[in-house]
Structures are given as C-alpha cells and as structure tokens.
C-alpha cells in the first residue's frame, strides 16, 4: 500500500468524528486534501468549514462546502489537520505547507484536534526527520536566523515562498527538540518570529494513523 492510500485511509476514518450541523475546522496539506475530498460526501449534513489556508478554502468550495472565516465562529466542534512529524505524546511539527500560523489560529478554536497522518510521520523525537518551519517577518529574517544558529539549529530560508500572511519561512535543520513545549515558547518569544511549527502547547487530542493494516485511532 502506498503513502497516498494510507493518507486517504486516515482521512476517511476522520469522518466518523464529524457531527451533523457542525462547522468543521480544516488545516492544510496533502492529507487534509484527502479529508476535504471525503468531506464533500457530507456537504449536506454540515453547516460548513473554517480553513487554515487559501488553498484549503478553494478545495472546500470546489466540494460545495460553505467556507466561514475564523472571525465568524467562537468555537469549532473539531479541527482536522495533518502533521510533518508526530511524537508519542501527540505533539507535532507542522508547517511544511507554510500555513502554520493560520493552522494554530484555527486549532485554538477547538478542544478536539484530530491529527491525520500516514505511518511515516511517527517519530520518537520531533525534529528527527523534518526541519522545523519558523514563520518570520521579512525584515527580521537574518536576525532570527542568527538566534536559531545560537540555539543549535541550521536555518535555511525557504526562498520563493511567501505565507498567506506575507511573511517568510526559515526551515531549521539538525534541530532535535527534546522539550517541545518549552522550545515552542522560547522560539515564539524571539522578536520577529510570528510563530513556529511546534504544536506542543496545543497538541492533538486524537491521532488517526493510516497503516498498511488499516486506520489506527490513538486517543
């Protein structure tokens, strides 16, 4: 079974958590794209969705699902998103698609964060296989990069990429994260950092892993 099939399996399994007449929060990325396609079959059973990226908004509209702004809702029943890495404590690295800030905003609207991944995304230590994305205000790029080097990382400017918020991304390589909640807070306190891709302070509540043996739900 290939990676795409495992992503589709996890996405399909997430539909069981969608409540009738609810507004669903959705993140961004390839696994979320699979979820949005699956959610299209339930378009008449839900009120709509709040999306964490412009790309996800477009896909939702193509499925005939009404899109709401995060400013239109006070809370969301569930938020469904993928991850670039996830550890056994359900903490994640996200931001490979450069939507990390909006993902954190939409995720903060729910108490039920459902992370859908294929089995290749599971790691023991965050930062083991995937660089940590950090969204930075453009004028602070070099200054923030120096701070990341001082913390032991190897930042690389993701050239040609501008976030939906008009900012740039630094990808921090060689940066194993032993204490994700503390590192998330420390990086967010650096002047010029909008946010970083560690999702530890608001970790997932439920993880659905697509495996060759089927979808595995971890609560």
Curated annotation (Swiss-Prot):
Isomerase recorded as keyword: yes
Pathway the protein takes part in: Carbohydrate degradation; pentose phosphate pathway; D-ribose 5-phosphate from D-ribulose 5-phosphate (non-oxidative stage): step 1/1
Gene Ontology molecular functions: ribose-5-phosphate isomerase activity
Reactions catalysed: aldehydo-D-ribose 5-phosphate = D-ribulose 5-phosphate
Alphabetical list of SUPFAM superfamilies matching this protein: D-ribose-5-phosphate isomerase (RpiA), lid domain (SSF75445), NagB/RpiA/CoA transferase-like (SSF100950)
Keywords: Isomerase
EC number: 5.3.1.6
Pfam families named among the record's database cross-references: Rib_5-P_isom_A
Residues reported in the UniProt entry to bind substrate: 28-31, 81-84, 94-97, 121
Gene Ontology biological-process annotations: D-ribose metabolic process; pentose-phosphate shunt, non-oxidative branch
GO CC annotation terms, alphabetical: cytosol
InterPro entries: NagB/RpiA_transferase-like, Ribose5P_isomerase_typA_subgr, Ribose5P_isomerase_type_A
Record flagged with keyword Mitochondrion: no
Annotated active site: 103
Subunit record text: Homodimer.
The family this protein is said to belong to: Belongs to the ribose 5-phosphate isomerase family.
Described purpose of this protein according to its UniProt entry: Catalyzes the reversible conversion of ribose-5-phosphate to ribulose 5-phosphate.
Official protein name in the record: Ribose-5-phosphate isomerase A
UniProt source species: Actinobacillus succinogenes (strain ATCC 55618 / DSM 22257 / CCUG 43843 / 130Z)
């Amino acid at each position: 079974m290939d990676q795409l099939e495992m992503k589709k399996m996890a996405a399909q399994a997430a539909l069981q958590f969608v409540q009738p007449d609810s507004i669903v929060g959705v993140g961004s990325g390839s696994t979320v794209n699979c979820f949005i396609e699956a959610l299209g079959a339930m378009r008449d059973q839900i009120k709509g969705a709040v999306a964490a990226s412009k790309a996800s908004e477009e896909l939702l509209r193509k499925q005939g699902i009404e899109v709401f702004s995060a400013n239109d809702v006070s809370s969301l029943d569930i938020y469904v998103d993928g991850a670039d890495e996830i550890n056994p404590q359900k903490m994640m690295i996200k931001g490979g698609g450069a939507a990390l800030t909006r993902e954190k905003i939409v995720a903060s609207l729910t108490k039920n964060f459902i992370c859908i991944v294929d089995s290749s995304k599971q790691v023991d230590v965050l930062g083991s296989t995937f660089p940590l994305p950090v969204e930075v205000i453009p004028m602070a790029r070099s200054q923030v990069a120096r701070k990341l080097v001082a913390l032991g990382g190897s930042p690389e400017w993701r050239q040609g990429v501008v976030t939906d918020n008009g900012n740039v991304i630094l990808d921090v390589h060689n940066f194993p994260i032993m204490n994700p909640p503390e590192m998330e807070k420390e990086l967010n306190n650096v002047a010029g950092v909008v946010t970083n891709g560690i999702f530890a302070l608001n970790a997932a509540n439920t993880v659905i892993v697509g495996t060759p043996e089927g979808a595995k739900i971890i609560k």
